[in-house]
Amino acid sequence: MAGANEIDMVISVGKFLQGNYEEVFEEIQEIKLSCRDAKLKVILEAGLYPTPQDLYRACILAMEAGADYIKTSTGKDAVASLYNAYVMCRAIVDFHEKTGVKVGFKAAGGIVTTQDALLYLTIVKGVLGEEWVNTTDFRIGASRLANNILSAVTKEEVKYF
């Protein structure tokens, strides 16, 4: 297979918060169609939503439009919190129960220590269940965590990622 296996896109948070839901939905849907066989990961920028309800609705909209994964953040803006991860996982559960479609979850931004990673794992296990705890359905984007682990193992400062 030539080309990308996955495509990342960032949801238009501003358009969503202005109530332009149809426009955001269509944008995600168009990108999904362009992906062909590649998986679409929609980055929510979870730290930018004023309420948990807004974040939840954005997750549902992204999944209904065709997201194969939803991701907390790029790490460039306000990073997601553990509570945001919980809200996103609840949205995945509700969507799965309604449609039978299994959507993956990726936590990213601000995950620096193994303790941070374990907290996200605990949320995924507790909310989504054991069947989501695999490399396909649950991921952690944590370049600083990787550097910290490599530094601890090699006993030298590593800034590889």
Set out the residue ranges of the language-model regions.
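Short C-terminal tail/terminal secondary-structure segment
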Residues: 145-149
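Short donor-sugar binding/catalytic loops of nucleotide-sugar-dependent glycosyltransferases
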Residues: 111
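Alpha/beta enzyme core
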Residues: 1-105, 114-143, 153-161
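Terminal helix/beta-alpha structural elements that buttress the NAD(P)+-binding lobe
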Residues: 108
